[in-house]
């Protein structure tokens, strides 16, 4: 890593969940290959996701989430953000970065505000079809905005927005080389259930209940991989054991891209990283947007894939165990439909997003405007 890092330092700032950190990791991999020394500024939640960064290149910045209107809580929040600003300034004085790139989440506010106030070029990447609150607060200050699913040429900041897609990690690109092979009607059917990096309690209850309603000969075909929150792991595993269905249940899978490539069908939330990985690998999916998202970003992400014919989208409120069982049974017995969905999903994937985002980052470092970058990248 260090013998290549002759271009200078770039700091990536990301909230401590997989949805923010996975695209940051993908960009880091691309930038390192180009000779950049890449550091990560994040929060304490990030420890299980930051294996791609050397320990001395991970910097925990004090931060807090702005929520509610309680004056005392708000005062504590703004105090934490101010301390994070001081942390960031101290870090940047030492590292002297040529660029700071934000990937969303409130922990990006202190580093991006500090960088812009210090005259360091800044760039934010918005993974979702609807801009998150932290990025909204930064959009007016940064040099450029990169979008994953943002609508093209619309919004107040269209002039400085470039649609790059969402960078995916190298293991996703490896998994993308595995072609989709539909299961025959009597073959084993590999189902992947994925709630995003933080899991989904709803799936831990609803999927076993739906599987219990399947005819016995259909249950006998199932091989399930399911991500579940730690508090739901044992109950989900026991439910499948009682039904006689082989199931690998865990809070987190380090090899999720390979498991996705191995799946015949995916049931998932529709966070931006999840949808991006589904499209790059090319797998048929049922997407159930998280219903309590503040900006309904997951619904917008899911709609983008559904419009291409790559997924079915179902509201959680409409998904009874009975309906879920019917949809699962239909998927298991319509291999041609799933094959078409897989092709449609892959057709909208952007496997070169990390390259394009790195190109934009280097353009901003060199002093180019977004307009100059766009003109130089026209087909």
Curated annotation (Swiss-Prot):
It catalyses: di-trans,octa-cis-undecaprenyl diphospho-N-acetyl-alpha-D-muramoyl-L-alanyl-D-glutamyl-meso-2,6-diaminopimeloyl-D-alanyl-D-alanine + UDP-N-acetyl-alpha-D-glucosamine = di-trans,octa-cis-undecaprenyl diphospho-[N-acetyl-alpha-D-glucosaminyl-(1->4)]-N-acetyl-alpha-D-muramoyl-L-alanyl-D-glutamyl-meso-2,6-diaminopimeloyl-D-alanyl-D-alanine + UDP + H(+). It is an enzyme of class 2 (transferase). Its EC number is 2.4.1.227. Signal peptide: none annotated. GO terms for cellular component: plasma membrane. GO terms for biological process: carbohydrate metabolic process; cell division; cell wall organization; lipid glycosylation; peptidoglycan biosynthetic process; regulation of cell shape. Keywords: Cell cycle, Cell division, Cell inner membrane, Cell membrane, Cell shape, Cell wall biogenesis/degradation, Glycosyltransferase, Membrane, Peptidoglycan synthesis, Transferase. This is UDP-N-acetylglucosamine--N-acetylmuramyl-(pentapeptide) pyrophosphoryl-undecaprenol N-acetylglucosamine transferase. One of its GO terms (molecular function) is UDP-N-acetyl-D-glucosamine:N-acetylmuramoyl-L-alanyl-D-glutamyl-meso-2,6-diaminopimelyl-D-alanyl-D-alanine-diphosphoundecaprenol 4-beta-N-acetylglucosaminlytransferase activity. Pathway: Cell wall biogenesis; peptidoglycan biosynthesis. The keyword Oxidoreductase does not apply. UDP-N-acetyl-alpha-D-glucosamine binds at residues 17-19, 128, 169, 197, 298.
